[in-house]
Amino acid sequence: MAERVATVSRDTHETQIQVHVNLDGQGHFQCETGVAFLDHMLDQVARHGLIDLDIHAKGDLHIDDHHTVEDLGITLGQAVAQAIGDKRGIRRYGHAYVPLDEALSRVVVDFSGRPGLSMDVEFTRASIGRFDTQLFWEFFQGFVNHAQVTLHIDNLKGFNAHHQAETIFKAFGRALRMAVEPDPRMAGRMPSTKGSL
């Protein structure tokens, strides 16, 4: 299988972002976004997804974190889509349940070519530190629109908002890892009866 790596840049009046992704990595992570809690969550994606991520971002954080978080989702989605190519030989579907103490989340992903986000999460706090929990939806919406995936995120249990978020991102990483894995039984074929995704 060809090397599955991509580097994508996004440069707007609001943000300047570069994302490098290696889908067949070791979980190496380097990130400077200015949004510390999101950096912590993206570290979980890299580590549990065994995806190498190198992310650099500058955004209009003097306004708030919204543009930076949304644009990071967009750029990461573009990088994953570019790295995965035409999707021949991948498992396509991935899912994971992840607990952290009292919290439990489930994430299911389909590299369907059809962007869609279903996110059933009621955070117990409006913010985690200074991070607005509404921005998680913006991040994932940006990701699905540009990775062209269907993504279901459900927080099943939890009263600690940090734990809720961490289980979501760990499960997201593990679901991605499963979905993008080469399936030896597919032998390079397209995982769809349509013949394309």
Curated annotation (Swiss-Prot):
Pathway: Amino-acid biosynthesis; L-histidine biosynthesis; L-histidine from 5-phospho-alpha-D-ribose 1-diphosphate: step 6/9. CDD domains: IGPD. It catalyses: D-erythro-1-(imidazol-4-yl)glycerol 3-phosphate = 3-(imidazol-4-yl)-2-oxopropyl phosphate + H2O. It is found in: Cytoplasm. It holds the Pfam family IGPD. Transmembrane segments: none annotated. Disulfide bonds: none annotated. It comes from the Bacteria. GO terms for biological process: L-histidine biosynthetic process. The keyword Cytoplasm applies. This is Imidazoleglycerol-phosphate dehydratase. The gene is hisB.
